UniProtKB/Swiss-Prot annotation:
A GO cellular component entry from the record: membrane
Low complexity bias spans: 1-20, 69-96, 438-448
UniProt cross-references to InterPro entries, sorted A to Z: AAA+_ATPase (IPR003593), ABC2_TM (IPR013525), ABC_transporter-like_ATP-bd (IPR003439), ABC_transporter-like_CS (IPR017871), ABCG_dom (IPR043926), ABCG_transporters (IPR050352), P-loop_NTPase (IPR027417), PDR_CDR_ABC (IPR010929)
All copies of domain ABC transporter, residue ranges: 123-364
Stretches for region Disordered: 1-96, 382-457
Positions in coiled-coil regions: 67-102
Biased composition (Polar residues): 59-68, 421-437
Locations listed in the record: Membrane
Leader sequence segment: none
Protein name according to UniProt: ABC transporter G family member 1
Compositional bias segments (type: Basic and acidic residues): 21-37
Organism of this sequence: Dictyostelium discoideum
Length: 793
């Protein structure tokens, strides 16, 4: 482990340098590509690429369904073919350089154009002060067509419906409403779509104890068809590592984002997540906030990697909240959502023109993404309006109100939204700079000369203005064009395709791979096992010291029952709580993998249960061995080895039962906080009716049923039977009552506590049923959570 830590530290040291050097390389590549595109506007030809890994064999398809395609363009392309060929000859060197940097970019065959039409989605909500739920529409008539080889960005303020739309497009959310999706003009089928697309979640849910290469090898063997040889799968992994620039960290632990387990950087984690989806060669890749939580340079590097994937012929669809301008420039098409409606759809570089035409202007130095989100974020409209007076008063005090009577325009100009020339503002950003004022006036004059209409004063769109903008889009040029394109796709431009059904790994392969991952995880974290082992030894020694070498006197009766209760609680409570804190992270990874169809629920559940069972057997055995001999559990003449093994068996069953309960609780509750609050209450409640604190004969009538469902009752009853059956106790003359010892036989102790002396093996099988029952319920909960079928209308 020390050597592993040293390697991790070394990788940590150069990961930043690696990220920076690769970042500079990406910038240089983008400059070369921009130079090439300016000199040669026609797209490069893509040769056929037989991707055996994804098991999909598409027929020849026409990916060039474009919003701007028409017969005139086709004729112009034919007339200019010779000129383009000359340009191609002049730029051969540039093309060769680009191909060397990305061999796969012009060899992707399975290109898919993705379209969606009239997506309407409703959710059930409860209004304040009312119990009845009402239906609220959160997506309204959303349309779009995404060409292969492009990046399609979905933007909008929080609550606009971005993630909901992406989940619907990815078939991860049932449509509660209507809508149709098309793949190359064919109505989307869930099974086909699952084979053609990859989905990258916002969070990087990865096993921290595996290296990057081990992670990709694991998913390659599970995601790729079973008939693909292992050698080809491993080669595919190496190709992806090369393509995504992960060579330097390939043998470094993934680690955790909070550095509890040190590993790769955030940008590398994001690229690993994307790489997992690339293993099967998907034609469509959907990403939820791919730059979330990353710094500026890392975000640019990740988006540059996605741009390369798009240039190779893949269709990239992503939601993104507020990208920097250099990232926004990478988008080919943009869907801007506001309150679940389409505010703009079309070319990303044409969005500003659209808003300019509607009277909303963005200054040249402002990031378009900031402008769009500031403009349509009506959720903070009321707060913004209420602060206007205070804002203007403050600016007059600081800026002196110089330059005009308007007063409040400086703050608006600072966020990049130009206002009416009649509303001259004060100093920009509270700085009295004459040069900036002159530039502002020149900009306003230029805008006035190019647009005769008076500019609206905008900080945020009012609700009325938002309604107007929503109504304007469907009748706009962009809205009419996309509707016409979708009609043509759904009626005329169908491109039939076939795919070969392939089989993934069988049950045994899935189980062995998942179990191997669990074993590796345990080996990479020996400290966790060591801590649990020390805890087990400490509990045994503590109990053994306190109850050391108990005799058979009258006072030992109480002490022997105390040993039983103490040690059962000692192994049970930690088993529950440790699972509550660990299992949620495992469930997160499972749900992500299950949604992608990586493996089935049963092999995952069995592999996890088997590994937990092994640990839950060893530790109680250690505790039981120490306690049994130190406390002198059996000293009667009928002593044999059988009571010792029965004692060990009871502690193992107690640990397994509570471990299974902890797994059930942690899989059922929404988070760790709820689990840590619920688990102790359940344990205490069931332990209260175990027969140790209250005699089972004294339980109130209306609660008489509760001891029968308390698993602690069966644990303690079996342990008491094992400790007291056929044991003879002694007493001194002073302790005798009427010449007789108060307690002579252990069998009497068992009966006085309300237990049955013949129920030991019955209780053993009841506890086995509890373990199975808790595990089956856990399996059903996981199965229910992982079910996510798409309802096609």
């Amino acid at each position: 482990m020390d050597s592993n830590n040293n390697n991790n530290n070394e990788n940590e040291a150069f990961s930043g340098a690696s990220e920076s050097s690769e970042f500079r390389k990406i910038v240089e590549e983008n400059e070369n590509e921009r130079e090439f595109e300016q000199s040669n506007p026609s797209p490069p030809e893509y040769s056929n690429y037989e991707n055996k890994d994804d098991g999909i064999n598409l027929e020849t398809i026409n990916p060039n369904i474009s919003l701007d395609n028409n017969n005139n363009n086709n004729q112009n392309n034919q007339n200019n073919q010779n000129n383009n060929n000359n340009n191609n000859n002049q730029n051969n060197n540039i093309i060769n350089n680009l191909n060397k940097k990305n061999k796969k970019r012009s060899t992707f065959k399975n290109r898919i154009d993705f379209s969606f039409k009239d997506i309407n989605h409703y959710v059930q909500i409860t209004e304040k002060g009312k119990k009845k739920k009402i239906s609220k529409q959160i997506l309204t008539n959303i349309n779009g067509h995404i060409e292969s080889g492009t990046i399609f960005a979905i933007m909008g303020p929080s609550g606009a419906g971005k993630t909901t739309l992406l989940d619907i497009l990815a078939h991860r959310l049932n449509i509660n409403g209507s809508g149709t999706m098309y793949l190359n003009g064919n109505k989307s089928d869930f099974n086909i779509f699952k084979k053609l697309c990859g989905y990258v979640t916002q969070s990087d849910s990865l096993m921290p104890s595996l290296t990057v290469r081990e992670t990709l090898n694991f998913y390659a063997q599970l995601k790729m068809p079973r008939d693909v040889p292992l050698k080809e799968k491993l080669q595919r992994v190496q190709d992806i590592i090369d393509e995504m620039g992960l060579n330097r960290c390939a043998d470094t632990l993934v680690g955790t984002a909070d550095n509890k387990i040190r590993g790769i950087s955030g940008g590398e984690r994001r690229r690993v997540t994307i790489s997992i989806e690339l293993l099967t060669g998907p034609s469509v890749i959907l990403l939820d906030e791919p730059t979330s939580g990353l710094d500026a340079s890392t975000s640019f590097y990740v988006m540059s990697a996605l741009k390369k994937l798009a240039k190779s012929g893949r269709t990239i669809i992503c939601t993104i909240h507020q990208p920097r301008s250099n990232i926004y420039d990478m988008f080919d098409n943009l869907l801007l959502l506001g309150d679940g409606n389409t505010i703009y759809y079309g070319k990303a570089n044409k969005a500003l023109e659209y808003f300019n035409a509607n009277g909303y202007h963005c200054s040249e130095k402002t990031n378009p993404a900031d402008f769009f989100l500031d403009l349509i974020n009506t959720q903070v409209e009321d707060q913004a309006d209420s602060d206007d007076d205070d804002y203007n008063d403050e600016e007059e005090e600081i800026g002196g109100g110089g330059g005009g009577s308007g007063g409040g325009a400086g703050g608006i100009e600072d966020i990049g939204i130009s206002i009416s020339p009649t509303m001259n503002g004060s100093a920009v950003d509270n700085i009295k700079n004459n040069e900036l004022k002159q530039q502002q006036q020149q900009q306003q004059q230029q805008q006035q000369s190019t647009d005769g209409r008076a500019r609206r004063r905008i900080k945020k769109l009012t609700k009325e203005e938002m309604v107007i903008l929503k109504k304007e889009y469907p009748n706009s040029e962009q809205g009419l064009r996309v509707n016409e394109t979708l009609d043509n796709i759904s009626k005329e431009n169908r491109t039939d395709f076939k795919y070969e059904k392939t089989r993934g790994p069988n049950f045994l392969t899935q189980f062995s791979l998942l179990l191997g991952r669990e074993v590796t995880n345990a080996k990479r974290h020996p400290m966790a096992f060591k801590v649990n082992l020390i805890q087990a030894i400490f509990q045994g020694l503590l109990c053994g010291i306190v109850y050391y070498q108990l005799g058979l006197g009258q006072s030992s009766v109480q002490s022997r029952t105390g040993v039983v209760a103490f040690i059962i609680m000692g192994v049970s409570f930690p088993a529950v709580m440790s699972t509550i804190h660990v299992f949620p992270d495992v469930i997160t990874i499972f749900l992500k993998d299950r949604a992608s169809g990586v493996y089935d629920t049963l092999p995952f559940f069995l592999a996890k249960s088997f590994m937990d069972a092994c640990i839950a057997v060893l530790l109680p055995m250690v505790t039981a061995t120490i306690v049994y001999w130190m406390t002198n559990q059996r000293v009667d003449p009928f002593y044999s080895a059988a009571p010792f093994f029965r004692f060990v068996l009871m502690l193992v069953l107690a640990s397994q039962t509570c471990l299974s309960l902890g797994v059930l609780i942690s899989s059922s509750v929404p988070n760790v906080q709820v689990g840590t609050a619920v688990a102790p209450l359940i344990v205490i409640l069931f332990f209260l009716f175990s027969g140790f604190f209250i005699n089972l004969n004294d339980v109130p009538g209306w609660l008489v049923w509760f001891p029968y469902i308390s698993f602690f009752r069966y644990m303690i009853e079996a342990a008491v039977i094992n400790a007291f059956k056929d044991v003879h106790f002694t007493c001194t003359d002073s302790q005798k009552i009427g010449g007789v010892c108060p307690v002579q036989y252990g069998n009497n102790v068992i009966e006085n506590m309300g237990y049955d002396i013949d129920h030991f093996w019955r209780n053993v099988w009841i506890l086995v049923l509890y373990i199975i029952g808790f595990r089956v319920l856990t399996f059903l909960v996981l199965k229910l959570k992982s079910r996510n079928k798409f309802k096609q209308e």
